[in-house]
Amino acid sequence: MNPKSNDANDSQNGTLQKNESAKSAKEIVMEYLQLITERQDFKSARSYLKDNVSYVSPLNSFDRAEPYLKYNESLHLPKLDIKKIFVDGDDVCILHETSLPRISSTVFTTLWFHVDGGKISSLRALFDPRPFIRPQR
C-alpha cells in the first residue's frame, strides 16, 4: 500500500489493509442489515456482498449475490429485534427475533456472517422453519 494514500485498498495486491479507514466486520454487517430491512435498498445492499456470496438456511441456499438479494426482497423483512451480537475477527453472529405478520409468527434466528476483504462472503441463517411450511389455519 502506498504510505501516502488514505485508501483502504492496496491496489498492488487487492487486499484490504487494517487501518482507521477500513470498516469492521460488525459495521459492514450492521449497515447491510439496515439496508435490506429498514431501508429496503437492495441496490445499495449489493455493494456489501461478494459476487459469489454463499447463503444457506433451512429453506434456501444461494451462491450468487443477485438471486440471494432477489429472495431477500421478496421477504419484505421488518427491522430485526436484535438480542445479542458476537464478533470474532471477520465473523459476526447475530441472535434476533423477527415478527412476521404474513405468517402470524415471531421467529428466533441466528445469523452467522463472514466478511472477507470488506464484503460479506457467506451467511448462514439458522431458525425453526415450521412456521413457513405448515398450512395456514
Label every PLM stretch briefly:
Residues M1-R137:
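C-terminal and inter-domain tail/linker signature
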